């Protein structure tokens, strides 16, 4: 979606520079892109570096980057995340362009009572309903943050929604189920209670087996939701040589022997996170099965590499196309990974 929006903006504003940022970039490309964005719209950016620039990004822009936008347009999301996003708006003292002297954030929403399908799938409709009802036309940050967030998540007060319709009640119940699932999942990763035995050191303090009823037994996840699938993204040219995508005309990657430590570190930095649906229950088995089979077939020698033996490789052709579990993939250094389902 971010890629489609970026393309539309570039078409509408041909003289502007549009930079896109999302999770489906190879690690090295993403690092370069983060550095570029920080330089262009970060704390030390200049009027010249900011002029005529449009940044299109997903939630990854919320993570750690000290960005400072003149104007923001965002999709509706839960209140705490929305307020976090606005923290990147007029973040530092600087002279703003004419007409943008006052910080303004435009929140995209549906014209009826429905919600964007992607946002509803990620956050659930209940929190979006409450955020929509509570969001004021004017915000004072940070003083407004505590009350707005508290009201959004206070299940004892639904006055902002008026009389609950059947649709609202259904969304509320779905949110309870979603929250309960998250709570049960989090319980699997609780630190064990401290022992009263004297003299016990901290060694093993964080050890805690995953409970048998955990749906992702054996996988110690760090985020909610479906498991993500990370691959090492490489290219196989027409001569059958394996290369780094970023400099496909230069670096050749060994497939018939364990790579040296320097080579292994370079390969490990080519990690790419696949779109979320590859991690869904109905897709993940086929995805992992194909990745493991192809990795074993081409890179069996890597089993002797401590850094790479647990990794799976996704090979793109020289045009940077690949097929994975019935999905056509294409990688572009400027726009990242795109896909087309069969």
Give residue ranges: language-model regions.
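Flexible glycine/serine/alanine-rich "lid" or loop that lines and gates the nucleotide-sugar donor pocket
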Residues: 66
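Conserved two-lobed SF2 helicase motor
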Residues: 47-62
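Short amphipathic alpha-helical segments, especially helix-boundary/capping motifs
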Residues: 10-13, 59-63
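C-terminal helicase lobe and adjacent C-terminal extensions/tails of nucleic-acid helicase motors
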Residues: 1-45, 69, 73-342
């Amino acid at each position: 979606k971010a890629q489609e929006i970026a393309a539309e903006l570039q078409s509408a504003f041909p003289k502007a520079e549009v930079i896109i940022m999302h999770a489906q970039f190879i690690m090295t490309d993403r690092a370069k892109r983060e550095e570029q964005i920080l330089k262009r719209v970060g704390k030390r950016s200049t009027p010249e570096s900011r002029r005529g620039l449009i940044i299109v990004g997903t939630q990854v822009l919320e993570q750690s980057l000290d960005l400072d936008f003149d104007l923001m347009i965002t999709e509706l999301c839960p209140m705490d995340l929305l307020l976090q996003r606005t923290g990147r708006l007029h973040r530092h003292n600087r002279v703003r362009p004419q007409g943008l002297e006052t910080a303004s954030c435009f929140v995209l929403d549906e014209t009826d009572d429905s919600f964007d399908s992607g946002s509803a799938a990620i956050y659930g409709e209940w929190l979006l309903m409450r955020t929509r009802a509570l969001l004021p036309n004017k915000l004072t940050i940070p003083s407004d943050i505590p009350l707005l967030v508290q009201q959004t998540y206070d299940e004892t007060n639904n006055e902002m929604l008026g009389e609950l319709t059947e649709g609202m009640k259904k969304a509320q119940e779905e949110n309870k189920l979603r929250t309960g699932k998250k709570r049960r999942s989090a319980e699997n990763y609780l630190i064990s209670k401290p022992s009263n035995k004297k003299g016990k050191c901290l060694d093993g303090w964080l050890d805690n087996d995953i409970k048998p009823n955990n749906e992702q037994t054996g996988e110690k996840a760090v985020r909610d939701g479906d498991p993500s699938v990370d691959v090492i993204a490489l290219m196989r040219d027409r001569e059958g040589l394996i290369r780094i995508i970023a400099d496909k005309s230069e670096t050749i990657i060994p497939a018939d022997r364990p790579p040296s430590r320097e080579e292994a570190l370079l390969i490990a930095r080519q990690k790419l996170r696949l779109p979320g649906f590859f991690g869904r229950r109905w897709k993940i088995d086929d995805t992992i099965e194909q990745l493991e089979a192809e990795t074993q077939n081409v890179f069996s020698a890597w089993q002797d590499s401590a850094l790479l033996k647990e990794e799976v490789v996704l090979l793109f052709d020289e045009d940077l196309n690949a097929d994975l579990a019935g999905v056509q993939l294409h990688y572009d250094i400027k726009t990242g990974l795109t896909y087309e389902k069969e």
